[in-house]
């Protein structure tokens, strides 16, 4: 059965693929978006696919190594500037967050439901695993990450429990950490049983984002995408939590809207918009949610690169 990504139809419409265009899928995953783009490209079109995850890249090579239109590169889309020349792309797609294969395979260490090694790295060869990081850093740093990236209100209590636990035995398994967090949440006034989500959801999110530098990569990748897009090219981003979406929304607004001015200060330079927002933020409808409950938090935003000469006229 072919995997259909979240908000697939809306993403394809947002990209507005032209037959001989050049496109980037910066988060290959299972390849659903890449296949959609290739169906719309002609023989003269080109698709660059990237992913941090070596397993995703292996899948891309199995699927598309014989297609001369496809160029496959292992790495974060934050490295886009090294691969694409300025104004060389007609469309860029980022489908953010953790992919279904990463969540569904316990050995990847992303799931708090299925037991596996406490890893959480999208590229297992890069940086520290979640277990290594939790064993090394201070209580304060753990709390800061859970609060900043997981928006976890009980971040200090959870961090304190982690440090106390690791003093006696190492945290090496996902369910081990999930059960520890659940025990902390059950002792709070809010109570884990009163929440609709698993008590470890926000903490796992925060640790995962930190370990993979997801928000840092997103900010760098958005700037690189803007530089690489041709005038008229489209930027399509699907985010899955408020931190990602806020960065995307603010990035588009910063390059599309005139910043507020202080009347008491002289105007130094004329603002030149580089992007145009295309429509409003899009969310999955009820029909899609029935098929794919993971789409509930997805938000899709589209922007179009402007011609600077046209923008200043």
From Swiss-Prot:
Catalytic activity field: cytidine(1402) in 16S rRNA + S-adenosyl-L-methionine = N(4)-methylcytidine(1402) in 16S rRNA + S-adenosyl-L-homocysteine + H(+)
Gene Ontology cellular component annotations, sorted alphabetically: cytoplasm
Pfam name, any one: Methyltransf_5
GO molecular function: rRNA (cytosine-N4-)-methyltransferase activity
Keyword Iron appears in the UniProt entry: no
Matches recorded under InterPro entries: RsmH (IPR002903), SAM-dep_MeTrfase_MraW_recog (IPR023397), SAM-dependent_MTases_sf (IPR029063)
Keywords per UniProt: Cytoplasm, Methyltransferase, rRNA processing, S-adenosyl-L-methionine, Transferase
SUPFAM superfamilies for the chain: Putative methyltransferase TM0872, insert domain (SSF81799), S-adenosyl-L-methionine-dependent methyltransferases (SSF53335)
GO biological-process terms attached to the record: rRNA base methylation
Location in the cell: Cytoplasm
Keyword Nucleotidyltransferase (UniProt): no
Binding positions (S-adenosyl-L-methionine): 31-33, 51, 77, 95, 102
PANTHER family with a match to the protein in the record: 12S RRNA N4-METHYLCYTIDINE METHYLTRANSFERASE, S-ADENOSYL-METHYLTRANSFERASE MRAW
Family membership: Belongs to the methyltransferase superfamily. RsmH family.
Main function: Specifically methylates the N4 position of cytidine in position 1402 (C1402) of 16S rRNA.
Classification via NCBIfam families: 16S rRNA (cytosine(1402)-N(4))-methyltransferase RsmH
Protein's recorded name: Ribosomal RNA small subunit methyltransferase H
Protein's organism: Xylella fastidiosa (strain 9a5c)
